[in-house]
């Protein structure tokens, strides 16, 4: 994610009610509805930060050093407990021999991704290494972790090009080399991954970025193929709505796409779908479902997207947070109408400002 206005990285928390910014000047945390700053760590405390991950809305943060003036190394994950008194609020440290590329948290585990390895530790009390998985080259540290208490599913790239691995951390035995289930999702390298909050669905896109495929975690079968576009694109983010009725994605094309999952008839189809029998290559294109709705953000600014709180049964909202400091909220209807409801510059909001 390209850096602008001092923002090195952006992440939503597990229920998408907050987002956090890893910055050249430290860390800032924002509540989404209403939009307001929830807290911050300044540069004197933590230096410049490359990555930050929240644990729900609690006092624990996972930090990885980065940027131009880091206080901490990029081979370490530091756990910051903001509830502790005094200046020393670093309570845990996980150090490796290679750079940490991503961190995921749930209430009882922490997952840390390196270029060719995924580590899983118990968390936060007396952390113990539970699992270690080898992966093919994973330069973006792709992985996702289900936050559900019922399902402890972890997904990450498999050994085969375009494959993803699915591990049930509940059933696997700590310390064992439990073989993950493999889903052959794409023909080219994976570019983006997401798992829904219930742990029942996985979405993936390749680095080509034209298609998003949806899989059932129980049967590991493909359920639907969603078409973002025809031109290659780098996907920054895929997210499910809270009840998994919808999915959104953002890319370097500057468009946030919204797809229907529960009622896929709401998605648009290619006009060629009405033509009749076509060749196999065109057939694949015709069979794809196009987004129900979409909106644009500055194309030169990387962004993450997520679903907001439902305002009514027939109106849903999507939030886009960009590294240029802008915040966008759009509402959409099942008919595909999409309108901007809010815009702000979150980096200009202070502690006492409320949106």
UniProtKB/Swiss-Prot annotation:
Keywords: Autophagy, Lipid-binding, Repeat, WD repeat. Pfam families: PROPPIN (PF21032). It comes from the Eukaryota. WD repeats lie at residues 2-40, 185-225, 230-269. SUPFAM superfamilies: WD40 repeat-like (SSF50978). It is found in: Preautophagosomal structure. The keyword Repeat applies. The keyword Membrane does not apply. A motif (L/FRRG motif) lies at residues 226-229. GO terms for biological process: autophagosome assembly; autophagy of mitochondrion; cellular response to starvation; glycophagy; nucleophagy; pexophagy; positive regulation of autophagosome assembly; protein localization to phagophore assembly site. Its main location: other. One of its GO terms (cellular component) is phagophore assembly site membrane. GO terms for molecular function: phosphatidylinositol phosphate binding; phosphatidylinositol-3,5-bisphosphate binding; phosphatidylinositol-3-phosphate binding; protein-macromolecule adaptor activity. Component of the autophagy machinery that controls the major intracellular degradation process by which cytoplasmic materials are packaged into autophagosomes and delivered to lysosomes for degradation. Binds phosphatidylinositol 3-phosphate (PtdIns3P). Belongs to the WD repeat PROPPIN family. The L/FRRG motif is required for recruitment to PtdIns3P. This is WD repeat domain phosphoinositide-interacting protein 4. It comes from Xenopus laevis (African clawed frog). The lineage of its organism: Eukaryota, Metazoa, Chordata, Craniata, Vertebrata.
């Amino acid at each position: 994610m390209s850096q602008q206005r001092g923002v090195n990285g952006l992440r939503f928390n597990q229920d998408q009610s907050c987002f956090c910014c890893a910055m050249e000047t430290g860390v800032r945390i924002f509540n989404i509805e209403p939009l307001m700053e929830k807290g911050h760590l300044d540069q004197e405390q933590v230096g410049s930060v490359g990555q930050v991950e929240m644990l729900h809305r609690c006092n624990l943060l996972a930090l990885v050093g980065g940027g131009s003036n880091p206080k901490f190394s990029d081979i370490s994950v530091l756990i910051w407990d903001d509830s502790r008194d005094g200046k020393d609020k670093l309570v845990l440290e996980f150090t490796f021999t290679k750079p940490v590329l991503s961190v995921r948290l749930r209430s009882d585990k922490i997952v840390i991704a390196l270029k060719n390895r995924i580590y899983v530790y118990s968390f936060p009390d007396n952390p113990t290494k539970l699992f270690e998985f080898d992966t093919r080259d994973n330069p973006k540290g792709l992985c996702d972790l289900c936050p559900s208490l019922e399902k402890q599913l972890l997904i990450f790239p498999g050994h085969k090009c375009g494959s993803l691995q699915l591990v049930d951390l509940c059933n696997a035995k700590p310390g064992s080399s439990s073989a993950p289930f493999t889903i052959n999702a794409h023909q080219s390298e994976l570019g983006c991954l997401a798992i829904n909050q219930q742990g029942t669905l996985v979405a993936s896109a390749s680095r080509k970025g034209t298609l998003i495929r949806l899989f059932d975690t129980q049967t590991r079968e493909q359920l639907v193929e969603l078409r973002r576009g025809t031109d290659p694109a780098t996907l920054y983010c895929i997210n499910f709505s809270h009840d998994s009725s919808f999915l959104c994605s953002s890319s370097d094309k500057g468009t946030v796409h919204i797809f229907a999952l529960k009622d896929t008839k709401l998605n648009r189809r290619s006009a060629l779908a009405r033509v009749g029998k076509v060749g196999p290559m065109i057939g694949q294109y015709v069979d794809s479902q196009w987004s129900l709705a979409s909106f644009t953000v500055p194309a030169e600014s990387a962004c993450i997207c997520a679903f907001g709180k439902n305002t009514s049964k027939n109106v849903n909202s999507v939030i886009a947070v960009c590294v240029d400091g802008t915040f966008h909220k759009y509402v959409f209807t099942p008919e595909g109408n999409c309108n901007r409801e809010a815009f702000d510059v979150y980096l200009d909001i202070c502690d006492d400002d409320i949106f």
